[in-house]
UniProtKB/Swiss-Prot annotation:
Cofactor section: [2Fe-2S] cluster
Family of the protein in this entry: Belongs to the MvhD/VhuD family.
Protein name: F420-non-reducing hydrogenase vhu iron-sulfur subunit D
InterPro entries hit by this protein: MvhD/FlpD
Gene: vhuD
Species the sequence originates in: Methanopyrus kandleri (strain AV19 / DSM 6324 / JCM 9639 / NBRC 100938)
Cofactor binding description: Binds 1 [2Fe-2S] cluster.
Length: 132
């Protein structure tokens, strides 16, 4: 039995989700393994959300937020960046590959960046496999 990888993407409503939506309306090709979770701001994404996604079956998790200096909620994306780094450190301490988690910054007009993020995290998922 072959399992299909699952990539969870936490996308802020303003930019990350806008880029995902633009990719969809533009009929961009990217792996169907991505599951998008729309959040008001990436500043609302905590370490617990990332770890829960992994615990519930995600092979990789990424956050798609506003470009640095352009967060609609001032510095939510920077707060999330610190949390992603903390999550990676915690995973490493637990013996889990920190490469399973990433953050990307993009504007709502950058569908290509969203597609590239999905493809990169899908490839990482295939390389790393599921969590045991």
């Amino acid at each position: 039995m072959s399992e299909e990888s699952v990539v969870v993407a936490f996308c802020c409503y303003e930019u990350g989700y806008g880029a995902a939506d633009l990719a969809g309306t533009g009929r961009a090709q990217y792996p169907s393994s991505v599951r998008i979770v729309r959040v008001p701001c990436t500043g609302r994404v905590g370490i617990e959300h990332i770890l829960t996604a992994l615990a519930k079956g995600a092979w990789t998790v990424f956050v798609a937020g506003u470009k640095k200096g352009e967060c609609s909620y001032e510095d939510g994306n920077l707060k999330c960046e610190r949390r992603v780094q903390a999550a990676k450190k915690l995973l490493e301490e637990l013996g889990i590959e920190p490469e399973r988690v990433e953050i990307y910054f993009m504007s709502s007009a950058e569908a290509d960046k969203f597609v590239a993020a999905v493809k990169e995290m899908h490839e990482r998922a295939k390389e790393l496999g599921p969590l045991a």
